[in-house]
């Protein structure tokens, strides 16, 4: 929930030469690997057949899937699930043009962003699987790489608010030259002109583990208003929460199951003997992160107050380090918050809450979560976000539409939070509306007068204290 108030006063290389090199036995060189969960073998077979059908029936030249998984601590990329990118509805029409059947980069990245909002911390859109003939893949490769670049950029924005560089720059493509089901993998450096390097794809039994905590905060920040620029809800919220997000990623104090652990330690020390499915975490932030060295009188012309109490359910590969586990928790918190802010901001084009006539305060209630587990990996909890009039059936439909999860109602949990009642919304406003707000007039010196009166009162109290002290001392 956020609320903002106006007009209040506050204080405040290597060379390509042929040579022999002696290998240091203590030095190991590892390469990143693309690992698909073994359960995805069935998906590959099914998807290849499905593409052959739509190719012959509708003439659709390619099928694309978003690969959901994790950037593992050892550099490998683990894939847990694949979600189909739909084609535009016009591609299914009887006389559809060839151009309408193509998956454009903007169309794909828009759908990837919707997926990102649903994923827990530690799980990302790590790449794209592509089913087509070889020529189509070659012709569309630049568009695929462009899409991956957009996805990485969006992931940075929604998961770290662009204040931390912890999102990997490497993403993957996995090409299936149908009807073959043999994967051809490549790792793409999206920050280096999309350069790619071939990489073998392997199927293994993969496992993730849950990281659980709760996070609540009250963030108060005055967002400076630029003259001539209308205030923007989303941009203002990014500015208002920037210090908090910075502090979150700089935080070094975390307990995992009640222990302080070294960042470089493996999260699970003995995987073969491990029986844990969940690890509880506690993060400790610097409470003075929003304090400045000097205090000056200022006028808060665009004050924002952000309140949240969020249940965190992140997930990481079981072979992760402590550092990456803690990072996933932070990613979850930021992504969960900003996913709601983005959805709310988009909905404001339809519904805009009226500003309080008394104080100019607007209260924004962000959508609440509904969740379901990824059936192949129960540690991965998928999120949907519901508005006040939405219900569990809406969440079930969204899970099916976006990820083809086909989840039953019984497996959708919307009990994490609830919408505030009208009475509770009024109670949120009340503490602020009880204050006396006065429009600031730059030509007026009333605030200076108030300051002078306070100084005078302080001097009088000081004099009285001195008189009493000397009277008692000499009596």
Swiss-Prot record:
**Tissue range of expression?**
Expressed in the amphid head neurons AWA, AWC, AWB, ADF, ADL, ASG, ASH, ASI, ASJ, and ASK, and in the phasmid tail neurons, PHA and PHB.
Q: Which residues cross the membrane?
A: 60-80, 453-473
List the InterPro entries hit by this protein, alphabetically. ODR-4-like (IPR029454)
Task: Determine if S-adenosyl-L-methionine is one of this entry's keywords.
Answer: no
- UniProt KW Endoplasmic reticulum keyword: yes
- In a knockout, what does one observe? Failure to localize the diacetyl receptor odr-10.
Going by the entry's taxonomy, the superkingdom of the source organism is recorded as Eukaryota
Keywords, sorted A to Z: Cell projection, Chemotaxis, Cytoplasmic vesicle, Endoplasmic reticulum, Golgi apparatus, Membrane, Olfaction, Sensory transduction, Transmembrane, Transmembrane helix
* Localisation per UniProt entry: Endoplasmic reticulum membrane; Golgi apparatus membrane; Cytoplasmic vesicle, Secretory vesicle membrane; Cell projection, Dendrite
Specify where it is mainly localized: endoplasmic reticulum
Topology class, membrane: Multi-pass membrane protein
Q: Which cysteines are joined by disulfide bonds?
A: none
Q: Which Pfam families match?
A: ODR4-like (PF14778)
Q: How does it assemble?
A: Interacts with odr-8 and odr-10.
| Purpose of the protein | Required, with oct-8, for the localization of a subset of 7 transmembrane domain odorant receptors, including odr-10, to the cilia of olfactory neurons AWA and AWC. Regulates chemotaxis responses to benzaldehyde, diacetyl and 2,4,5-trimethylthiazole in AWA and AWC neurons. Plays a role in nociceptive neurons to mediate avoidance of high oxygen.
Q: What protein family is recorded? A: Belongs to the ODR-4 family.
- Name this protein carries in UniProt: Odorant response abnormal protein 4
Organism from which the protein derives: Caenorhabditis elegans
GN (gene name): odr-4
């Amino acid at each position: 929930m956020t609320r903002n108030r106006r007009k209040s006063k506050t204080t405040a290389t290597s060379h390509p030469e042929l040579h022999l090199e002696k290998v240091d036995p203590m030095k190991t060189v590892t390469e990143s690997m693309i690992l698909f969960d073994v359960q995805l073998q069935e998906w590959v077979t099914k998807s290849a057949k499905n593409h052959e059908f739509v190719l012959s029936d509708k003439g659709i030249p390619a099928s694309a899937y978003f690969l959901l998984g994790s950037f593992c601590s050892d550099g490998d990329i683990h894939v847990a699930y694949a979600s189909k990118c739909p084609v535009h509805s016009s591609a299914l029409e009887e006389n559809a043009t060839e151009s309408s059947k193509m998956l454009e980069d903007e169309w794909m990245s828009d759908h990837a962003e919707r997926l990102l909002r649903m994923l827990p911390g530690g799980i990302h859109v790590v790449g794209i699987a592509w089913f087509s003939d070889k020529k189509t893949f070659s012709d569309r490769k630049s568009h695929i790489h462009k899409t991956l670049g957009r996805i990485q950029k969006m992931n940075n924005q929604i998961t770290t608010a662009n204040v931390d560089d912890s999102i990997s720059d490497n993403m993957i493509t996995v090409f299936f030259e149908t009807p073959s089901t043999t994967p051809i993998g490549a790792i793409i450096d999206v920050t280096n002109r999309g350069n790619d390097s071939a990489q073998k794809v392997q199927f293994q039994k993969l496992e993730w583990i849950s990281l659980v905590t709760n996070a609540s905060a009250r963030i108060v920040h005055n967002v400076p208003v630029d003259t001539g620029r209308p205030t923007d809800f989303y941009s203002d919220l990014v500015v208002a929460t920037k210090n908090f997000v910075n502090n979150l990623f700089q935080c070094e104090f975390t307990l995992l199951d009640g222990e302080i652990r070294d960042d470089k330690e493996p999260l699970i020390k003995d995987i073969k003997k491990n029986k844990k499915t969940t690890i509880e975490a506690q993060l400790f932030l610097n409470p003075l992160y929003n304090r400045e060295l000097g205090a000056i009188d200022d006028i808060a012309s665009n004050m924002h107050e952000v309140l949240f109490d969020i249940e965190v359910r992140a997930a990481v590969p079981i072979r992760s380090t402590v550092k990456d586990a803690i990072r996933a928790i932070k990613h979850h918190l930021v992504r969960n918050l900003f996913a709601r802010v983005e959805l709310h901001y988009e909905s404001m084009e339809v519904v805009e809450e009226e500003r309080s006539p008394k104080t100019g305060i607007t209260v924004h209630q962000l959508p609440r979560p509904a969740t379901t587990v990824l059936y192949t990996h129960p540690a991965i909890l998928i999120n949907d976000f519901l508005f006040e009039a939405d219900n569990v059936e809406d969440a079930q439909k969204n899970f099916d539409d976006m990820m083809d999860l086909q989840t039953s109602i019984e497996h959708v949990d919307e009990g994490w939070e609830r919408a505030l009642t009208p009475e509770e919304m009024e109670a949120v406003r009340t503490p602020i509306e009880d204050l006396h707000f006065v429009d600031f007039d730059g030509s007026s010196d009333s605030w200076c007068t108030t300051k002078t009166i306070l100084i005078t009162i302080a001097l009088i109290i000081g004099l009285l204290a001195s008189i009493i002290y000397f009277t008692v001392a000499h009596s």
